[in-house]
Amino acid sequence: MYSIKTDHKLMPRERLIRLGPEKLSNQEQLAILLRTGNKEKHVLELSAYLLSSLDSLADLKKFSLQELQRLSGIGKVKAIEIKAMLELADRIQIAGQAVADPVLSSAQVAEKMMIELGDKQQEHLVAIYLDSQNKIIEEKTIFIGTVRKSIAEPREILYYACKNMATSLIVVHNHPSGLTKPSANDYHFTEKIKRSCDYLGLICLDHIIVSKYDYYSFREKSDLF
């Protein structure tokens, strides 16, 4: 659990101006984002309460909008603001990790995508489009799955490949269960997308399954490539 302190004489905004954002605690940073408290709790107490509900700061990402709203003092508006802040932070991190150099291995792509998709609670299918120098042209989320729906047709993957005039592509999806062992459907889909790419003169470099801590590369571990 976090150790929460509320003895600062200056309010978080004043401390940020005077000392810089890197000097503020997680509690103070969150208090700035929350902006105000409520009738029962000062904003610093509210941020302390929220952080005390976590084992680690990373757990904040796991709260759904509804779960945040169920916390005392966190209404709908504050819950929306927190979720938006977390999503923006993810996008900033992803943008900062954009691969400018050529993609040289499946492991390189897997490491990047484990960060991006490892915490997702639904299955995400992402296509990474590359030019003739193996540099990334675009990374596109093609599909977000539900319990009743699974990855089906490669049509949309190929549409964006043609739109980007890509030379090759890599398909990545996550297993929310944390287990990266491919299913029979994963094998079938890999064969299907590879055949479709061959038909259009595209190179399917790999299909990678990721979790938070592991990955499976069809190129590295199967005989499909």
From Swiss-Prot:
Q: Which UniProt keywords apply?
A: Hydrolase, Metal-binding, Metalloprotease, Protease, Zinc
Supply the Gene3D superfamilies for this chain: Cytidine Deaminase, domain 2
Transmembrane residues, as ranges?
none
Pfam families recorded = RadC (PF04002), UPF0758_N (PF20582)
Q: Where does the motif JAMM motif lie?
A: 173-186
InterPro entries cross-referenced by the UniProt entry? MPN (IPR037518), RadC_JAB (IPR025657), RuvA_2-like (IPR010994), UPF0758 (IPR001405), UPF0758_CS (IPR020891), UPF0758_N (IPR046778)
Q: Set out the biological process GO terms recorded for this chain's protein.
A: proteolysis
- MPN domain residues are 102-224
Residues involved in Zn(2+) binding: 173, 175, 186
UniProt family annotation: Belongs to the UPF0758 family.
Query: What is the protein named?
Result: UPF0758 protein SEQ_1136
Q: Which organism is it from?
A: Streptococcus equi subsp. equi (strain 4047)
